[in-house]
Amino acid sequence: MTQLTRFQTALKEAGAKCALISSELNIRYLCGFNYTDGYLLISTDRAYLITDFRYIEAAKAAVTNFEIVMPRGNMLNEIKSLLEQNDVTTLLVEEDELSLAAHKRLSGVFEGVELVPGASVILKNNREIKLAYELDIIDRAQRITDAAFDHILGYITPERTELDVALELEFFMKKMGAEALAFDTIAVSGKASSLPHGVPSAEKLSKGFLTMDFGAKYNGYCSDMTRTIVLGRADDEMKKVYNTVLTAQRAALDALHEGMICRDADKIARDIITEAGYGENFGHSLGHGVGMFIHESPRLASGAPESSVLCRGNVVTVEPGIYLEGKYGCRIEDMVAIDLDGSVRNFTKSPKELIEL
């Protein structure tokens, strides 16, 4: 089964005839081709890739199962013609991606065609369940990320800045084969480590915790990992904070299984952190799905519905943290999957014992 046939099956099940896909990542997800100007028009039995002259040759070499169309004039007019040829009067669009301006533009061109939401829901549900090849690509992305962590431990010196560390991680990941970054790299030290999404500064590294949250993008798929180390020596409270986060993470990881209610994983980690006296200092959810998008479903969160359960093909992060405002913070993050045989696979191999440099 391909991502295209999965989508077409879901279209049929939804009672829909045709969908228009315009967002870059979803286009790549469905056809495997990375380009920035075009559309996919997918019906239950046909699929078109519409793009301009710049991408035609590459598309023909890379894409199968799609009819590749180069517009003779305006791209939207070409799509309108295809809609008319296929007797389409109702068109599913990506409700989560389409701006109001784009919606108005499409409505103005596609006269007599009703634009309805629904494509985003189908894609979200499909992306949540990875196929075997997707898990293999994510594993490769994480291997690049693990290698970057091993490298950075030998790079860090007191003369480095947070920005030095972030840029070195990024350079190394690209050197190892990453096509891009999964997200903006976080490398924050000392008091700045209390900011869960702190921005690296040009200041020299501060003593204390150094939190590094980074990931590679490989063949379109993301990895996501956080490690916190100590620059200098950890005092007793820092050791308590670190070990509490590590204990919470390991407990949640050990409990993960096929069929687990997602919010229960969050509760396991949160209860341990709360018991240690830091409940108010763990302000985000335990984890999120990862795929072509760095944040996907499912969510390991206290607010997740009871109906949200872990199933085969899910990839999630497990990333508890403790943040003491104006003092420091600590987060440890692994990325795991419920594998296709129902077992739990931890993609992340980097050490988690307290490291002092």
Where in this protein do the model-derived segments appear?
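Active-site neighborhoods and metal-handling regions in enzymes and metal-associated proteins
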Residues: M1-L357
